[in-house]
């Protein structure tokens, strides 16, 4: 799809790119630290101006950085290792009328490698580019909290696409039911989509592939991870210690600035129909009892505002206070990362500028936002039982089953857990924070899930309840990080065996007394009062 002539193979340029990169000399990278050559260095003046002007200043600095990188993606050396072929055919047909970027996980225009690759193909072939998003009226157990955040972000995407002369199409229905028909009706010559390791998304991709005409090339670009999932490792990694060096070794090749998505010069006769956003919300078949939250405003612009506030106000304390739920030291970027409204790569590019001032904070943020996040994608990509006890290591399955019949000190129903009606005021406060705010402090997520193991009838039920509650209330639900968080807490994924005890077996144990040694538990309990 990226050939100079439409009759040529779409894989040729990718093969050339890989060949050149395999011969390139890699510069050594110190552990937990980026070399100066791995990013386009920003002038100190830009950094200062961005800090002084706040979020608007950051957005302008970012825009200028893209323009300095390349006039467009056509003049940018695109790393084809980000791309993998889904279809069998890789030749573009002569009668092709346009390209499509099927947006799914990465719901933003700029800083989006999948969008950029789609525009690159369209510019090379001098064809129009369309963006399609497939909106199902219901999705698993998603609530209006999730849909509202997503739709308001997509509304911003649609507005930006219009300014760039790229039609945005909101297709109502499952991808297999609406996207192939759009392709056939409008003579689409090729499709680019983004990447998710989760089963529902991989099934959508397969269903679309099966329904597409065989002659339509279909490729996938990992626009979510800095190091593409299939490049970072070709197998399920045991833990952070085994994947960390693989990611850091590859960062010099992948942690680059982005070129801009530009105003597309080739217009289409197929215009996008105006989207009735209010009508879309009204037609959703979702639970509306889990309300929207006020602290997180959807969209890329608001996400960059949150990034700027993190850098200016909380990054200095992230290294020392990130595990204290009473301290405001976290990035709070998880919802924007989950919906792809802000690129993790963009966040790292901006945060790492401050390494000299806050080395510990930057190192720890990179560990969490890059290594741990990409480890979660790795687990879900290579382990299809990522949300089941069967996905755990053999030692963990064995120890949990040996202790499955151990007497529980308390047993709670799903309804009691959901409403925060347990004997544990810290657990109740953590649950109510999730219900009210759509988020839970990272340290408490571990304690919260481990107590569910202790208070339910079996490890299978504990995992089921934890995932249900996480996905129902967290703004970043249905995410690899959420599944891995529950699997780490309950099933020991990416962990080791510990001293054996009742119920937990060899799974790492946490308790109320341990939390009291970490932070002022009473202060947190006072801040988050249980529901009436």
From Swiss-Prot:
UniProt keyword terms in alphabetical order: Chromophore, DNA damage, DNA repair, DNA-binding, FAD, Flavoprotein, Lyase
InterPro entries in the cross-refs: Crypto/Photolyase_FAD-like_sf, Crypto/Photolyase_N_sf, DNA_photolyase_2, DNA_photolyase_2_CS, DNA_photolyase_N, Photolyase_Class-2, Rossmann-like_a/b/a_fold
Binding site for FAD: 468-470
GO BP, sorted A to Z: photoreactive repair
Official protein name in the record: Deoxyribodipyrimidine photo-lyase
Positions of the Photolyase/cryptochrome alpha/beta domain: 97-229
Annotated EC: 4.1.99.3
Chain spans, region Interaction with DNA: 368-376, 442-443
Cofactor annotation: FAD
Family assignment from sequence similarity: Belongs to the DNA photolyase class-2 family.
């Amino acid at each position: 799809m990226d050939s100079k002539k439409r009759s040529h193979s779409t894989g040729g340029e990718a093969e050339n790119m890989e060949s050149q990169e395999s011969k390139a000399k890699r510069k050594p990278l110190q552990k937990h630290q980026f070399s100066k050559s791995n990013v386009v260095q920003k002038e100190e003046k830009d950094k200062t101006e961005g800090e002084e002007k706040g979020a608007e200043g950051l957005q302008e600095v970012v825009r200028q950085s893209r323009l300095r990188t390349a006039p467009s993606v056509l003049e940018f050396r695109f790393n084809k290792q980000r791309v993998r072929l889904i279809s069998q055919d890789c030749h573009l047909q002569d009668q092709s009328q346009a390209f499509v970027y099927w947006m799914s996980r990465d719901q933003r225009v700029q800083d989006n490698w999948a969008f950029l690759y789609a525009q690159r193909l369209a510019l090379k072939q001098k064809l129009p580019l369309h963006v399609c998003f497939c909106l199902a009226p219901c999705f698993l157990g998603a609530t209006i909290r999730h849909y509202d955040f997503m739709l308001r972000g997509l509304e911003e995407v649609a507005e930006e696409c219009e300014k760039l002369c790229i039609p945005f199409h909101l297709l109502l229905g499952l991808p297999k039911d609406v996207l192939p028909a759009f392709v056939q009706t409008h003579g689409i010559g090729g499709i680019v989509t983004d990447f998710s390791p989760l089963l529902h998304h991989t099934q959508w991709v397969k269903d679309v592939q099966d329904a597409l005409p065989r002659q339509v090339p279909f490729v996938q670009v990992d626009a979510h991870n800095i190091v593409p999932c299939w490049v970072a490792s070709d197998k399920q990694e045991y833990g952070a210690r085994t994947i960390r060096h693989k990611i850091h070794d590859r960062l010099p090749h992948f942690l680059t600035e982005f070129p801009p998505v530009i105003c597309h010069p080739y217009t289409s006769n197929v215009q996008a129909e105006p989207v009735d956003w209010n009508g879309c919300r009204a037609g959703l078949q979702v639970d509306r009892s889990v309300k929207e939250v006020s602290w997180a405003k959807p969209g890329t612009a608001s996400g960059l505002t949150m990034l700027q506030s993190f850098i200016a106000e909380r990054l200095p304390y992230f290294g020392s206070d990130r595990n204290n739920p009473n301290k405001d030291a976290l990035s709070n970027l998880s919802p924007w990362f989950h919906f792809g409204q802000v690129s993790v790569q963009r966040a790292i590019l901006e945060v790492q500028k401050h390494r000299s001032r806050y080395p510990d904070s930057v190192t720890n943020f990179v560990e969490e936002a890059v290594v741990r996040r990409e480890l979660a994608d790795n687990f879900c990509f290579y382990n299809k039982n990522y949300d089941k006890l069967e996905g755990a290591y053999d030692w963990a399955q064995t120890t949990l089953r040996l202790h499955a019949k151990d007497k529980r000190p308390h047993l709670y129903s799903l309804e009691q857990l959901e409403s925060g009606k347990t004997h544990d005021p810290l657990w109740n406060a953590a649950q109510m924070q999730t219900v009210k705010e759509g988020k839970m402090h990272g340290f408490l997520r571990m304690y919260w899930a481990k107590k569910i193991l202790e208070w339910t009838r079996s490890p299978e039920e504990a995992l089921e309840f934890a995932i249900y509650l996480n996905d129902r209330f967290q703004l970043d639900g249905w995410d690899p990080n959420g599944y891995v968080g529950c699997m780490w807490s309950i099933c020991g994924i990416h962990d080791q065996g510990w001293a054996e005890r009742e119920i937990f077996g060899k799974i790492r144990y946490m308790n109320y007394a341990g939390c009291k040694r970490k932070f002022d538990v009473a202060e947190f309990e006072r801040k988050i009062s249980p529901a009436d």
